[in-house]
Amino acid sequence: MKFWKYHGIGNDFIVLDCITDPVPVDPAWCEQVCDRHFGIGADGVLYILPGQGTDITMRIINADSSEAEMCGNGIRCVAKHAVDTGLVDKDEFTIMTGRGVLKAKVRKDPDDEYTSFVQIDMGAPILDARSVPVDFDGRFIDQPFEADGVKFHANAVSMGNPHFLSLIHI
């Protein structure tokens, strides 16, 4: 099995081209290879699969074997890999994700053959707390929150995977 290791703004992934070399999506295997002590080590495995009415499909299996709908850092790695390896032969294309169809735009470095810029239209953020999911009615925006005796305000948002955000003034 051939794989690639990609890094995207602090996340690292094992990338599998399942178009050229089909392998089954196997969450238990992903958990093993993502282990940083006994495996390759990664935040997750990115499967690049044939498109479903799109140019390609991406599935993400996290290091704990759960499946994510989307990951911004992961989809940029997938888009770069797809163009750099010839799976996709255009600068703008579509990727099916667990969150739906997302549009990718890439730009190659004029001095070499590799992609130097990747832009993904992530769509609108999900702000409804129950859809994030958070046990709260409505939008969880600038809500008071306490953890370990520290009080702060936080926001719950999803772009296909849940985020809990707090702005901190330093």
Which residues make up each language-model segment?
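ATP-dependent small-molecule kinase catalytic core of the GHMP/sugar-kinase superfamily
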Residues: T97-L167
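A glycine-rich beta-to-alpha transition motif near the start of alpha/beta enzyme domains, typified by
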Residues: M1-Y114, L165-L167
